[in-house]
């Protein structure tokens, strides 16, 4: 028997290092935006989820300061005890309006929303069908639920249909779970087809709108709005920490669903309520995206400019460096392995670009992931293209 029960940690760390999977934090020394300061150097930021550039917006900052002055720095308890403020309820009403649902519920993070909701609506007698590219929080929520999990190959509707045909009748409840925008590839789920299958096989459907909220849809309502599926029966989950520039998560759906979750979801019941500052910032962000659709339009214009610049430089498509589909502001450049990805990320930094390597186990294959923002200027996009060209030669 080993003398030290913690000795395995050193061995595990060594394995992580050998696989080039080791991670460490990088300290950003500036306010969020298209230009950031890292290690004393200004870089163009292509690694942020701040799609609409709201995290550094003075109106969000002012709202957070005012809420802190009025309500304090923390909520001090769970929402069912001392942690509820009127501003929480106001935010939930605005989310429900944005998502065009009967009701909504705010969580302290998107991760907590996913694991809490999934493990509340299904359990050991039930079936979960999950896209293989789903976010970690969706996968861990499925595991926590104790339900039977079937992972279907990415966006493979025929495979999913076959599994529902074979397995659905053996279980009490069925839940299909998917990201609407897949965060590490940038492609979209086939939402209308998933809704058809859910209806046909008496299955619930949960869609994680983390990277779609504020970005997709004529009003910023996400992929549900983008695909004209508003009003359909489904569970919508999202985050306040990406395009909304704050922190927290939400679930939107029917009044009965939200009342049930408020009474049964441990990650909401037993967690301190979202801080007044984060709540106020998110509330302000929703109001801004409704009043300023030009922010969203500028984001999509930047994507169009980037695609045009990219496609005129055919060198980038040589040597197997074929990019992902252009369905969202997330563009991926697949690479051979973690070592190559780390080298490319470092070379980009030397060219004034911050777009670090994405490696296993976060993803199956290594890549550079580019995230566009509405606050990027055309010159920023041109500098990125120039840097990519230099690397491809």
UniProtKB/Swiss-Prot annotation:
Q: Which reaction does it catalyse?
A: 6-carboxyhexanoyl-[ACP] + L-alanine + H(+) = (8S)-8-amino-7-oxononanoate + holo-[ACP] + CO2
Q: Where does the chain bind substrate?
A: 23, 135, 362
Q: Which residues form the signal peptide?
A: none
Q: What residues bear N6-(pyridoxal phosphate)lysine in this entry?
A: 242
Gene3D superfamilies given for it? Aspartate Aminotransferase, domain 1 (3.90.1150.10), Type I PLP-dependent aspartate aminotransferase-like (Major domain) (3.40.640.10)
Gene Ontology BP annotations: biotin biosynthetic process
Q: Which PROSITE patterns match?
A: AA_TRANSFER_CLASS_2
Q: Name one GO molecular function term.
A: pyridoxal phosphate binding
Is Transferase a UniProt keyword of this protein? yes
Against Pfam families, the record matches this protein to:
Aminotran_1_2
Cofactor entry: pyridoxal 5'-phosphate
How does this polypeptide assemble, per the annotation?
Answer: Homodimer.
State the similarity comment.
Answer: Belongs to the class-II pyridoxal-phosphate-dependent aminotransferase family. BioF subfamily.
Q: What does this protein do?
A: Catalyzes the decarboxylative condensation of pimeloyl-[acyl-carrier protein] and L-alanine to produce 8-amino-7-oxononanoate (AON), [acyl-carrier protein], and carbon dioxide.
Which protein is depicted? Putative 8-amino-7-oxononanoate synthase
Question: Which organism encodes this protein?
Answer: Trichodesmium erythraeum (strain IMS101)
């Amino acid at each position: 028997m080993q003398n030290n029960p913690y000795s395995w940690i050193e061995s595990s760390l060594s394995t992580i290092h050998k696989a080039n999977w080791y991670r460490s934090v990088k300290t950003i020394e500036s306010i969020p935006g298209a230009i950031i300061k890292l290690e004393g150097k200004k870089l163009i930021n292509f690694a942020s989820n701040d799609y609409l550039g709201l995290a550094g917006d003075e109106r969000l900052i002012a709202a957070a300061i005012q809420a802190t002055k009025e309500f304090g720095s923390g909520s001090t308890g769970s929402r069912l005890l001392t942690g509820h403020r009127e501003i929480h309820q106001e935010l939930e009403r605005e989310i429900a309006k944005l998502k065009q649902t009967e009701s909504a519920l705010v969580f302290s993070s998107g991760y907590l929303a996913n694991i809490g909701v999934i493990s509340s609506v299904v359990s050991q007698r039930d079936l979960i069908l999950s896209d293989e590219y789903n976010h970690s929080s969706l996968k861990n929520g499925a595991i926590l639920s104790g339900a039977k999990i079937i992972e279907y190959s990415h966006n493979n509707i025929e495979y999913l249909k076959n599994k529902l045909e074979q397995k659905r009748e053996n279980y009490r409840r069925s839940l299909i779970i998917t990201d609407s925008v897949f965060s590490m590839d940038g492609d979209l789920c086939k939402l209308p087809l998933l809704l058809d299958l859910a209806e046909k096989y008496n299955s619930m459907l949960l869609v994680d709108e983390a990277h779609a909220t504020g970005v997709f849809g004529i009003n910023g309502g996400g992929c549900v709005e983008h695909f004209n599926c508003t009003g359909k029966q489904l569970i919508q989950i999202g985050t306040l920490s990406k395009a909304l520039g704050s922190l927290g998560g939400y679930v939107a759906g029917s009044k009965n669903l939200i009342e049930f979750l408020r009474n049964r979801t441990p990650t909401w019941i037993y967690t301190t309520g979202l801080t007044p500052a984060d709540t106020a910032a998110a509330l302000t962000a929703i109001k801004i995206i409704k009043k300023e659709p030009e922010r969203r339009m500028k984001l999509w214009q930047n994507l169009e400019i980037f695609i045009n610049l990219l496609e005129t430089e055919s060198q980038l498509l040589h040597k197997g460096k074929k990019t992902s589909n252009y369905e969202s502001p997330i563009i991926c450049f697949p690479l051979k392995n973690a070592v190559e990805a780390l080298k490319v990320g470092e070379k980009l930094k030397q060219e004034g670009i911050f777009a670090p390597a994405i490696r296993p186990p976060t993803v199956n294959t290594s890549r550079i992931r580019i995230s566009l923002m509405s606050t990027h200027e055309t010159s920023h996009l041109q500098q990125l293209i120039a840097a990519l060209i230099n690397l491809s030669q």
